[in-house]
Amino acid sequence: KPNDFFWIIEGKLAVSECIGGGGLTARKIRREEEIQWLKSQGINSIFSLLDSDFNLKNYQEVGFRTYHFPLGENVSVESVDVIFEAIKEALSDKERKLLIHREYLDEEVPGILAGYLIYSKLLDDPIFARTILERILGKPLSPKAIALIPTL
């Protein structure tokens, strides 16, 4: 399975680092093994937050639906809102099981996931959304991540 793989919404929304590893650690064999593992878990769509379109064509060739929303260095509220809406739209299909990934599970990704839980109205308490993500990931969210969670 990919490094740092976690279900955020069991059987529906997951997160991990880049399939096959990121940067210099990426390996084709590892990527192929992780793709097979993801398929065995029912994942059928990849939502990439990578700056480049790295591997999107490969994902499409093996049957994944792909989404690409490059997340730059300075994440704006506007770009996060676009990402929240895109995730919501992707998950509106009951058959879709979505994996969100970036090169590494960095500071922004947990904030985006907690923020999505609020944005989509699955949760209505930003502090509870933060707590849920901290429990799932087994680590506290950074101030940078917390800043991405919408307040009501």
Regions found by a protein language model. Name each.
Residues R102:
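Conserved S/T- and glycine-rich ATP-binding loop of Class I adenylate-forming
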Residues D106-I112:
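Glycine-rich nucleophile elbow surrounding the catalytic serine of serine-hydrolase chemistry
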